[in-house]
Structures are given as structure tokens and as C-alpha cells.
Amino acid sequence: MNDIENLDQPPAIFIMGPTASGKTALSIALRQRLPVELVSVDSALIYRGMDIGTAKPSAEEQALAPHRLIDIRDPAESYSAADFRKDALKEMADITAAGRIPLLVGGTMLYFKALLDGLSPLPSADPQVRQRIEQQAAELGWEALHQQLAEIDPVAAARIHPNDPQRLSRALEVFFISGKTLTELTKISGETLPYQVHQFAIAPVSRELLHQRIELRFHQMLDAGFETEARALFDRGDLHTDMPAIRCVGYRQMWSYLSGEIDYDEMVYRGICATRQLAKRQMTWLRGWGSVQWLDSDKPGEALDSVIQVVSA
């Protein structure tokens, strides 16, 4: 996952980082100083009506620095890494054609990887195969299907939890359609990104400080009306916790509260813990990322200058 060295290719900037690390603020500041246009790389910000719980850039922030690929799906709709790559490449081409630089900002590391390294040649979803798998699950339980996957593809089974029906179903579906395991197919990469990419990761030096920010921001979301926002989605009646939108951090815990499974205090506790776990996963991705320049989110001025210096060189 190295920077693309071909200087004949147009430039692009990646601003990556864990949740609550200051990515949005840095990107908006860069928009004031460089000829950049922002493209969101966030699997939660794509959904309309999910603003507070996703920490979506405010109307004022988007007026200062419009973000592309925000509010492009209803929460009932699906959106894959392949969908993102196709949409992002189009936005990047449009930005480059206008003589500006695409700045991709977010924390969905799978999307960044798909964009940078291309996608493995996985088969498209097959509703009939998926239905057959779900019928098996209803009869035998997901634990039995997980054991089946362990025989077919032990590497994937070790990565996928038995209580993760979406990923479990997909791993089985890939094998039933293609005759090849998910592990085999994901080793084959697709097209790389035709840009000279400057990659940055922003995070606090202290993990404790990041945890404090996460807790503070979750309480700020609640004060801003997160429960009301989630209840509006809950009351629609067509959304449930098997959908990617409702599995987003914060919304899943709010759903448990609204359905009476847990009380308010437990929802807050679980929401903060889940957000911390998300940040930990994001940091794990980034530490193994390769060619990336780290920025200290506690020194925003220095971070801004560092990006400008590298991009302008």
C-alpha cells in the first residue's frame, strides 16, 4: 500500500484516521489553503437521515467545504466497497478534470484499500443462493453454517464470528457461486489507483486522549438529539439490525435501547465501548498500512502545514 510514485499521474490526497481524530477539521482547513475538493470515505455518512449519530459534517462545515459521497443512500439500501470504488473514481476524475485535487477523507479503511489496491474478482450477490443459505440458517442455525464454512474455508471462518450472519452468508455464497473460497479470491487484487497519492493518518499521540474524545463526542451527540434521530428511523418499521446502516456504531446500541432490550445508561456505556473498539480496529489497519505520514491531531496547525508542504513539493 505504497504511495504511487509515477509523477506523470495526477495528485490525490488521503486523510485517514480513527473516529474522533480531527479528520474533518483538518480537511476543511486544507480546503481553505489548497485547490482541493473533498470526497467522503465513510460507510456511515452515505446514509440520509443519519446525521447526529455519524458525526456528519454540519451544514456550516459542508458550506465551507462540500463533501461528495455523503447522503447518497437511504438506510434501507446496501452499498458495497465496489460501489464506493466506482463512485469515488468518478468523483476523482471530475475533480481532476476541473483542475483541482481530490482529497479523500474518512475512516472506512476497507474503502481506502479498495480504492488504492483495486478489488478482488468476487462474484456478484445471487439472491437465490443467499435465500438458500438463509433457509439453512433458519433450520440449522448460524453456528452450524459457521462449522460448514470452517470445513470449506478455515481461514475465513477464523476471521468471521458465528454471530455475523452477513459476512458468514457472503463467504458461503462466494464458494457456492464460484467454487473458490473467499480466501483464494481475495488474494487476487484488481486495478490499482491511477493517481500519485499522498497518504496521511491523523490521530492523537495518546490513546487515553482519543478515548476521552470519543466519550465526550458521544455525550455531545446525545445532547444534540441522537435519540430523536434514531427513533425516527426505528419508527419507520422497515429497518432492522441485519442492515449495515443500523449496525453502524451508536445506532445498533440505540436500537437495543429503543426496542427495550437495555436501559438508557447501558446504551450509553455500550455505545462508547463500541466506538472505542471501532477506533482500535481503525488504528490496527493504519499501523499496517505502509507508506503513510502520521499527523498529531493535538497540533492541528503543524498537521495542516505538514500536508501543505508535502503536497506543494
Swiss-Prot record:
EC number per UniProt: 2.5.1.75
Residues annotated as binding substrate: T19, A20, S21, G22, K23, T24
Region span, Interaction with substrate tRNA: 42-45, 166-170, 247-252
Binding site for ATP: G17, P18, T19, A20, S21, G22, K23, T24
GO molecular function: ATP binding; tRNA dimethylallyltransferase activity
Cited InterPro entries: Dimethylallyltransferase (IPR039657), IPT (IPR018022), P-loop_NTPase (IPR027417)
HAMAP family, alphabetized: IPP_trans
Function field: Catalyzes the transfer of a dimethylallyl group onto the adenine at position 37 in tRNAs that read codons beginning with uridine, leading to the formation of N6-(dimethylallyl)adenosine (i(6)A).
Gene name as annotated: miaA
Protein name per UniProt: tRNA dimethylallyltransferase
Species annotation: Yersinia enterocolitica serotype O:8 / biotype 1B (strain NCTC 13174 / 8081)
Subunit structure: Monomer.
Positions of the record's site feature: Interaction with substrate tRNA: T108, R130
Highest taxon, organism lineage: Bacteria
Keyword terms, alphabetized: ATP-binding, Magnesium, Nucleotide-binding, Transferase, tRNA processing
